Amino acid sequence: MNAAATMEHTLTLLAERPIELRHGLYERFFAEFPARRAAFLCPEATSVRMTDETLQLLYGLAGGEKWVWPLVAELVATHQAYGDLPLGEYDAFVDMLVEELEAVLGIDWTEDQADAWHEQAEALKTMIGKAQAEWDHVLPRG
């Protein structure tokens, strides 16, 4: 099974769970970055959108989708409105999402799933870093 198929299987398993991935993800994120909580004016809406977008980006990367790069670049640009967001925070969010997937799936989480999700997470983090560097060149932060 290729990475995209493995990830699709993961998402199918996730959909069968009575748990929303976003709750644990945001508990983790706000525990590590408590100052960021204030930036979320409506966390119930924002957490759904950001979790779904990140899952879509990771899955899109696995499938070689061309829309991923423009969306990443746009998301990084729009996040500049929230002030200085260090690359480490983006990286931590992506890593936490994969960790939360593993936690939610428990015994159904396989080595193949871990490999697929971690590989795409690394690719996404690299892409976010590239987008941030390009935006900093044309629209410096601060």
Predicted segments — roles?
Residues M1-G142:
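Globin-like tetrapyrrole-binding proteins
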